[in-house]
């Protein structure tokens, strides 16, 4: 089953593909999630040895989806004590098989040119 998020006009639409057509399953306020099309079905399972820094896009009964750069990561929801806030820019790492969530620090810098 393919799922995607369509974010536009302040709304977040969860869509599922049925027989080649996208059907809307759920509509919610987008909050701080940027407008765009997010193909959740392309999400790779989280690597527990890596720290994942990015925006939390969606959470369902099984997974928490996070955008890391241009890729999507899915975290097993049962590994969280509390699901992170949707739209939040967070760092997720694993310790003793549990997901640890912390506010991500944005890296701001400038390149020097000669």
Predicted features, each with a name:
Residues 12-13, 63-64, 99-101:
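Hydrophobic residues embedded in beta-strands of well-ordered beta-sheets
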Residues 5-6, 54-58, 82:
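Short, exposed beta-strand/loop patches in secreted or surface proteins that constitute
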Residues 69-86:
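Beta-strand/loop nucleic-acid-binding surfaces
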Residues 57-63, 67-72:
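Short, flexible beta-strand-to-coil junctions
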Residues 31-61, 89-94:
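Structural detector for short beta-strands of small beta-barrel domains
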Residues 4, 9, 84-105:
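Flexible glycine-rich surface loops and low-complexity tracts that mediate binding to linear polymers
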Residues 65-66, 106-114:
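Non-Sec secretion/translocation targeting segments of pathogen effectors
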Residues 7-43:
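A general sequence property marking short-to-moderate contiguous segments
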